[in-house]
């Protein structure tokens, strides 16, 4: 596991950089503090809790199998933090960003991401004013649950169709990113339906707005996730093989 430590300084520099340089309020994929009505904020939190519990159980088992998994879990969490802190301006006056959940999804499965994702979202809400505490459940459902689950299904399907590993990882990361934004669009569209056209029209409008910047971001995230996974596999082949 000593080889893994070479990644830590770069990850820490990224975390420190985004913590110090992005303290402003964000209007990105993360639904901002106070934006959702209380009943919806509570609803999404209640829906998210079972996934969080299952994720904690899964992580406990992984650590019981091998304590060195802690470092890989931390690396995946840091990868999520750094990528999801990269805010890219959008034509809407908002901004978009990668999610970073594909790496952990491929390595540990989607349940683990529910824990890593909510930890990242909590830190971003407290340190970067990115997202919020009251909207934590809604943001966690989109980025830490539904996105990773969609990505995982796509990854497994791609492997079953004999796609090579890199292509499968790329598709996982890309679809997890897009699924996150589509879920956020649904969450917002349900709460804020179009006065004239209704809920579905509102959802489609949010999706169209996000797609302008999110599709190229998702493609870039897929490529970066492949590079990161291959880098870890090259330095820790036995460890990665064990996780499979």
UniProtKB/Swiss-Prot annotation:
Transmembrane feature ranges: 37-57, 71-91, 103-123, 135-155, 166-186, 206-226
A GO CC term attached to the entry: ATP-binding cassette (ABC) transporter complex
Pfam families, per database record: CbiM
GO biological process entries: cobalamin biosynthetic process
MF terms (GO), sorted A to Z: cobalt ion transmembrane transporter activity
Keywords: Cell membrane, Cobalamin biosynthesis, Cobalt, Cobalt transport, Ion transport, Membrane, Signal, Transmembrane, Transmembrane helix, Transport
Topology term for the membrane: Multi-pass membrane protein
Pathway this chain belongs to: Cofactor biosynthesis; adenosylcobalamin biosynthesis
Subcellular location(s) per record: Cell membrane
Residues making up the signal peptide according to the UniProt record: 1-28
InterPro entries xrefs: CbiM (IPR018024), CbiM/NikMN (IPR002751)
This protein's record includes keyword Transmembrane: yes
UniProt KW Zinc keyword: no
Family assignment from sequence similarity: Belongs to the CbiM family.
Known partners and oligomeric status: Forms an energy-coupling factor (ECF) transporter complex composed of an ATP-binding protein (A component, CbiO), a transmembrane protein (T component, CbiQ) and 2 possible substrate-capture proteins (S components, CbiM and CbiN) of unknown stoichimetry.
Function: Part of the energy-coupling factor (ECF) transporter complex CbiMNOQ involved in cobalt import.
PANTHER family associated with the record: COBALT TRANSPORT PROTEIN CBIM (PTHR43627:SF1), PTHR43627
Protein name: Cobalt transport protein CbiM
């Amino acid at each position: 596991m000593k080889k893994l430590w070479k990644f830590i300084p770069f990850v820490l520099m990224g975390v420190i950089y985004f913590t110090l340089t992005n303290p402003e309020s964000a209007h990105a994929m993360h639904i901002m503090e106070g934006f959702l009505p209380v009943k919806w904020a509570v609803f999404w939190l209640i829906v998210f809790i079972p996934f969080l519990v299952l994720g904690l159980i899964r992580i406990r088992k992984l650590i019981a199998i091998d304590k060195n998994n802690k470092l890989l879990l931390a690396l995946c969490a840091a990868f999520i933090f750094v990528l999801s802190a990269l805010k890219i301006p959008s034509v809407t006056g908002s901004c978009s960003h990668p999610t970073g959940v594909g790496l952990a999804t491929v390595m540990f499965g989607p349940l683990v991401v529910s824990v890593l994702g909510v930890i990242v979202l909590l830190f971003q809400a407290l340190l970067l004013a990115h997202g919020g505490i009251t909207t934590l459940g809604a943001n966690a459902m989109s980025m830490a649950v539904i996105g990773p689950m969609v990505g995982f299904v796509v990854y497994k399907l791609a492997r079953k169709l004999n796609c090579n590993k890199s292509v499968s990882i790329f598709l996982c990361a890309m679809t997890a990113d897009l699924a996150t934004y589509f879920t956020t669009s649904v969450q917002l569209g349900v709460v804020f339906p179009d006065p004239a056209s209704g809920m579905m029209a509102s959802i489609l409008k949010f999706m169209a707005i996000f797609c302008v910047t999110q599709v190229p971001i998702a493609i870039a995230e897929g490529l970066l996730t492949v590079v990161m996974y291959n880098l870890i596999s090259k330095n820790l082949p036995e460890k990665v093989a064990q996780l499979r």
